[in-house]
């Protein structure tokens, strides 16, 4: 089941650094305004071809060295709080 059309013209996030994360981030750019790919390290486990596809997509922004600390919202997601693993600073997407 694909829920991508529910996110049409929205800014969304994908968490992870493997092939599945790269594939979903790339696929979701068909619907979303932008996709932020959040990964806890600065290196990825994804295969080179999957990583290159994601890196060559202008709609995908990479946020490395960050972890998710909270999902904001009651009945729907309104934001995603992430923490920089180097500085400890928190940001809301």
List each model region and its residues:
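Glycine-rich dinucleotide-binding loop and its adjacent helix/turn
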Residues: 1-31
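A Rossmann-like FAD-binding core segment of flavoenzymes
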Residues: 30-93
């Amino acid at each position: 089941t694909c829920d991508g059309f529910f996110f049409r013209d929205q800014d969304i996030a994908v968490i992870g650094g493997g092939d599945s994360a790269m594939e979903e981030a790339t696929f979701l750019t068909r619907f979303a305004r932008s996709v932020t790919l959040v990964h806890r390290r600065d290196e990825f486990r994804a295969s080179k071809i999957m990583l290159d596809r994601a890196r060559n997509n202008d709609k995908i922004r990479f946020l490395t060295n960050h972890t998710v600390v909270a999902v904001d919202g009651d009945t729907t997601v309104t934001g995603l709080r992430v923490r920089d693993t180097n500085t400890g600073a928190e940001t809301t997407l």
